[in-house]
Swiss-Prot record:
Protein name stated in the entry: Phosphoenolpyruvate-protein phosphotransferase
Reported cofactor(s): Mg(2+)
KW Transferase (keyword) present: yes
Catalysed reaction, written as an equation: L-histidyl-[protein] + phosphoenolpyruvate = N(pros)-phospho-L-histidyl-[protein] + pyruvate
Alphabetical GO biological process terms: N-acetylglucosamine transport; phosphoenolpyruvate-dependent sugar phosphotransferase system
Originating species: Haemophilus influenzae (strain ATCC 51907 / DSM 11121 / KW20 / Rd)
InterPro entries assigned to the protein according to its UniProt record, in alphabetical order: PEP-util_enz_mobile_dom (IPR008279), PEP-utilizing_PTS_enzyme (IPR050499), PEP_util_AS (IPR018274), PEP_util_C (IPR000121), PEP_util_CS (IPR023151), Phosphohistidine_dom_sf (IPR036637), PTS_EI (IPR024692), PTS_EI-like (IPR006318)
PANTHER family per the UniProt record, alphabetical: PHOSPHOENOLPYRUVATE-PROTEIN PHOSPHOTRANSFERASE
Membership in a protein family: Belongs to the PEP-utilizing enzyme family.
């Protein structure tokens, strides 16, 4: 039994299909001057074949994964057809008198190495994209066979060192039951795409390809993060029972799909979903989300070579708003920086990127980016119920400046004869202690708050949750964090405004009743968590939750708060 990083939840039973990479063997013998033209021709033939394959993969991804995920392969095609890359490879071929395969491998390997050595998790994982492109190009130059994962004929759990984005997009979902890899993280494209496909996946096991052979029977328990290799009969029975239990729970929860999140004593809140692309709207709809509480627009800006145009953004936002069919969609403006970088934006290397030039700070400095995005948002507001919010706000001055920009853009759109919602709601993310402490002033300036507990916790406790030495100190249930949350909620209510939450805490069942009792108006989370949170809210009295919250806010430690919640859940048979 092995474990790794839980990338996409679910349980799968089946035979392993281990993807063994056909090793690329390069002929390093020098070529002669009269062979150079032939090798240049081989390069172009190989590249043309790779481009044709990627175009086919992109079309398949567009159908099965949606426009945003298909854009990954637009990025791959742009790299593959990049004139500077072509020039580098051919210059290396001619000057070093090596064949096309060696030249392409050498130049692309240099790029992979450079990205892998950068101290940035997002860019490190993009090295896998370049590796994918390199393998495809070199194999085509050498005339090697490339496995078509869309042609798998038997039900299988795929086992691989890694699955590239192009391989993941090709998967025959009627036959592929799940995926296990040696490497990868939760933010890798493989993980993101597995979640979009609702395909059980565990990545980053380090050794699964060494321990598993094709034909071995596997249980992929992507609930408890375990992979069983040739399990015993009792293990199979145990996991089958778990699978049946999960199926029963899903069937029961599905009955809540069209029911409101309303307590036993009639207090109504909204349970909504976080999304990153139009594709995610399917999951939101399927799980009964009452709207979109966080549309992460930065995915539109990633995996491409240039900024998305106003028109591209407008189309993307309009699609989501129309898909939600009258339910509120809250768009967060581009939250780039920190752990999310863009190759084309030339962000500075900073000692403390999470405290640096990021999110709204970039937008206020780069007005062309801000204006294009806000114009697109305003135009999309003519097609449904839409609100906009700004990340990383610390002051009243910032929000006043942003509101002035919105009014200027509204005037422009009126002059152009374009339609928009003149009363579009404007809100801010409360994810800095400054915004939380100043909530009573900010509440006078905006229509709503959305609390981002991930960053608020990190900044309040001065804890980098990615630092293994101190990550145990990261706790959104810390009394100081809860005190700030309560302060924000009360400040909004004092001005007749509402407060939502879109951080991980919003989808944490142990925190639900506490947040409910504190007066939170909207819970926004991964779509898959919506039914459970809705069920919990529908099985409790708001007044009881309020007493729980009032008591918890008097406790000096997170442990005491946790104990109080545990006792409440037991007493009310909510465990």
């Amino acid at each position: 039994m092995i474990s790794g990083i839980l990338a996409s939840p679910g349980i799968a039973f089946g035979k392993a299909l281990v993807l063994k990479e056909e090793k690329i063997v390069l002929d390093t013998q020098k070529i002669t001057d009269d062979q150079i033209d032939a090798e240049v021709a081989r390069f172009y033939e190989g590249r043309n074949a790779a481009v044709e394959q990627l175009n086919s993969i992109r079309e398949r991804a567009l159908i099965s994964l949606g426009e945003e995920k298909a854009a990954i392969f637009e990025g791959h095609l742009m790299i593959l057809e990049d004139e500077e890359l072509e020039e580098e490879i051919l210059d290396y071929l001619r000057s070093n008198k090596v064949n096309a395969g060696v030249a392409a491998s050498k130049i692309l390997d240099q790029q992979v190495t450079m990205l892998s050595e950068i101290d940035d998790e997002y860019l490190k994982e993009r090295a896998g994209d370049i590796r994918d492109i390199a393998n495809r190009l070199v194999k085509n130059i050498l005339g090697m066979y490339i496995v078509d994962l869309g042609d798998i004929q038997e039900e299988s759990i795929l086992v691989a060192y890694d699955l590239t984005p192009s391989e993941t997009a090709q998967l025959n979902l009627e036959k592929v039951l799940g995926v296990v890899t040696d490497i990868g993280g939760r933010t890798s494209h493989t993980s993101i795409m597995a979640r979009s496909l609702e395909l059980p996946a565990i990545v980053g096991t380090n050794k699964v390809t060494k321990l598993v052979n094709t034909g071995d029977y596997l249980i992929l328990d992507a609930i408890n993060n375990q992979v069983y290799i040739n399990p015993t009969a009792s293990q199979i029975d145990e996991l089958k029972a778990l699978e049946a239990k999960i199926s029963e729970e899903k069937a029961e929860l599905a009955k809540l799909k069209d029911l409101p999140a309303i307590t036993l004593d009639g207090h109504k809140v909204d349970v909504v979903a976080n999304i990153g692309t139009i594709r995610d709207c399917d999951g939101a709809e399927r799980n009964g989300a009452e709207g979109i509480g966080l549309y992460r627009t930065e995915f539109l800006f990633m995996d491409r070579e240039q900024l998305p145009t106003e028109e591209e953004q407008f189309i993307a936002y309009k699609q989501v708003v129309e898909a939600m069919n009258g339910r509120l969609t809250v768009i967060r403006t581009m939250d780039i920086g920190g752990d999310k970088e863009l190759s084309y934006l030339d962000l500075p290397k900073e000692m403390n990127p999470f405290l640096g030039w990021r999110a709204i700070r970039i937008a206020l400095d780069r007005r062309e980016i801000l204006n294009a995005q806000l114009r697109a948002v305003l135009r999309a507001s003519a097609f449904g119920k839409l609100a906009v919010m700004f990340p990383m706000i610390i002051s009243v001055e910032e929000i006043r400046e942003l509101k002035a920009v919105i009014e200027t853009l509204k005037a422009e759109l009126r002059e152009e004869g374009r339609l928009f919602d003149n009363n579009i709601q404007v809100g801010v993310m409360v994810e800095t202690p400054s915004a939380a402490v100043n909530a009573k002033f900010l509440a006078k300036e905006v229509d709503f708050f959305s609390i981002g507990t991930n960053d608020l916790t990190q900044y309040t406790l001065a804890v980098d949750r990615g630092n293994e030495f101190i990550s145990h100190l990261y706790n959104p249930m810390h009394p100081s964090v809860l005190g700030l949350i309560k302060q924000v909620i009360d400040a909004s209510h004092a001005e007749g405004k509402w407060t939502g939450m879109c951080g991980e805490l919003a989808g944490d069942e142990r925190a639900t009743l506490l947040l409910l009792g504190m007066g939170l108006d909207e819970f926004s989370m991964s779509a898959i968590s919506v039914p459970r949170i809705k069920k919990l809210i529908r099985n409790v009295n708001f007044q009881d939750a309020k007493v729980l919250a009032d008591t918890a806010l008097q406790k000096p430690t997170a442990a005491e708060i946790d104990q109080l919640i545990e006792e409440f859940l037991l007493e009310n048979s909510l465990n």
